[in-house]
């Protein structure tokens, strides 16, 4: 009888809810409930035990699971609201048996209560709102919770959004922000300002709760002015991490065929310049996980990219150059490259040396697509004072429109030579007599590490309403 009673309660609620929605349609109300589930695996071919005394620094492997649900509502004439939540899990972590040399009492050490391995630093990492005090991992978050309003009349429009939401179309900021932004646009020119109180990585390969870990406990503000007409886009901007960094920059892009639809020819050329000025002492180290290079007083980033399209084929190349430690405070949680730069090793900095101090990178790629299948081959050459890297990667992707399933596979050869005088991992920790014990010390010679790996991601999307 109890089951029958609750069934009728649920049926009554459903009928009432449907009637309520039908009435709201007259007021321009609309709603959707969508979600996805995904699994991500990175498997490093260098899967030996961690033995720094023998110059063995493995890559590490892990598998994560992610579930997501989002409710989106169009409330009334340009007013929208969205709320969504995510939950992650870490079913496999190779570092549980590969070991590490983190001192006892520190996050990730042998006595760490958070887990037998250290990949919780990727899936679940939480260091409080400040981003500076490591706490118990968080495997669930409300990543979307915002209100937005957009108004448009003739050639004039403006909009505002506040809460937690996915930050879009920023050269040096990606993923989710907790904050507010607004824009004003007239004809082909738009002014936009964003204030970010905290940032979150919300994906199947990285799951970090909202915090200020990427700005050393400070807030971030961005202002950009974009002019876009026909084939040309000119986008000057300014990024500020208060009391730490101030950075003007510009993106200039020329596109011969903005409405390209896989037929004919298209060329897209992009130049990005970024010029951070640091307000911290010149000898203070960067926040990149290397933490081995002083920030200095200023830096420069120059990025040139060419992309060619012919029917379903594409090819091109790019050059990325840092003068000084330009990305020491920004450029690691968002960059204009368009490539995943977090593919190194958990035993070093997972981030590549692509954004290191005084680095120069070259990229070449070719690819094509057929129906739901696409492929790409990407080669990378990286030289920097800290490390040199060579990489050749094959990307395969397939999307089934019928079943709403996407599969992505990457197979990458990746070699890294870390140079004498630098550390693989954190420098400056206590180093005992045991060379495999706690602590990391500068290398006495160059060390080659195989960072080759395979990545596989499968995602199923669904719609409830």
Which residues make up each language-model segment?
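Extracellular loop and loop/strand-boundary signature of outer-membrane beta-barrel proteins
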Residues: 52-57, 131-133, 165-168, 208-212, ...
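Outer-membrane beta-barrel translocator/channel fold
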Residues: 91-95, 192-233, 237-248, 257-340, ...
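C-terminal structural cap/anchor segments
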Residues: 322-399
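Residues that define the transmembrane beta-barrel architecture of outer-membrane proteins
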Residues: 29, 61-67, 138-143, 174-178, ...
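Surface-exposed coil loops of outer-membrane beta-barrel proteins
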Residues: 109-226, 233-236, 240-242, 337-355
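Transmembrane beta-strands of outer-membrane beta-barrel proteins
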Residues: 29-37, 79-83, 156-160, 182, ...
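Beta-barrel outer-membrane channel/assembly domains of diderm bacteria
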Residues: 22-160, 368, 377, 395-397, ...
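Residues on the lipid-exposed face of transmembrane beta-strands in outer-membrane beta-barrel proteins
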Residues: 67-73, 145-151, 180-184, 223-229, ...
């Amino acid at each position: 009888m109890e089951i029958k009673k609750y069934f009728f309660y649920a049926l009554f609620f459903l009928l009432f809810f449907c009637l309520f929605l039908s009435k709201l349609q007259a007021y321009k109300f609309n709603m959707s409930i969508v979600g996805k589930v995904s699994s991500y695996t990175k498997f490093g071919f260098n899967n030996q035990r961690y033995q720094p005394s023998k110059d063995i620094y493995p890559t590490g492997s892990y598998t994560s699971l992610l579930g997501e649900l989002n409710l989106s509502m169009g409330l009334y004439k340009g007013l929208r609201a969205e709320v969504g939540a995510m939950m992650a899990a870490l079913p496999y972590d190779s570092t549980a048996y590969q070991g590490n040399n983190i001192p006892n009492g520190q996050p990730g050490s042998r006595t760490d209560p958070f887990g037998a391995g250290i990949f919780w630093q990727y899936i679940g990492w939480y260091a409080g709102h400040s981003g500076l005090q490591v706490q118990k991992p968080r495997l669930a978050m409300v990543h979307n919770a915002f209100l937005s309003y957009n108004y448009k009349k003739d050639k004039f429009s403006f909009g505002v959004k506040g809460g937690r939401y996915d930050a879009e179309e920023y050269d040096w900021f990606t993923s989710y922000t907790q904050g507010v932004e607004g824009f004003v646009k007239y004809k082909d020119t738009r002014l936009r300002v964003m204030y970010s109180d905290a940032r979150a990585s919300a994906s199947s390969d990285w799951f970090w709760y909202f915090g200020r870990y990427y700005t050393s406990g400070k807030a971030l503000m961005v202002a950009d002015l974009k002019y876009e007409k026909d084939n040309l886009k000119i986008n000057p901007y300014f990024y500020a991490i208060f009391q730490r960094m101030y950075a003007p920059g510009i993106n200039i892009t020329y596109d011969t065929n903005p409405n390209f639809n896989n037929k004919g020819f298209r060329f897209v050329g992009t130049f990005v310049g970024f010029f951070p000025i640091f307000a911290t002492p010149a000898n203070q180290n960067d926040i990149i996980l290397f933490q081995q290079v002083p920030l200095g007083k200023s830096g420069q980033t120059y990025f040139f990219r060419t992309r060619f399209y012919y029917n379903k084929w594409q090819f091109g190349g790019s050059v990325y150059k840092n003068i000084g430690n330009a990305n020491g405070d920004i450029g690691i949680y968002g960059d204009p490259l368009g490539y995943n730069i977090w593919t190194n090793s958990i035993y070093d900095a997972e981030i590549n040396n692509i954004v290191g101090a005084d680095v120069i990178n070259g990229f070449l790629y070719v690819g094509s697509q057929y129906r739901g299948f696409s492929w790409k081959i990407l080669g990378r050459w990286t030289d920097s004072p800290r490390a040199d890297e060579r990489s050749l990667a094959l990307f395969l992707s397939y999307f089934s429109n019928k079943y709403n399933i996407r599969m992505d596979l990457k197979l990458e050869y990746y070699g890294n030579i870390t140079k004498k005088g630098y550390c693989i991992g954190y420098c400056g920790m206590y180093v005992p007599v045991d060379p495999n014990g706690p602590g990391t010390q500068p290398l006495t010679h160059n060390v080659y590490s195989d960072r080759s790996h395979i990545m596989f991601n499968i995602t199923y999307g669904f719609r409830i309403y």
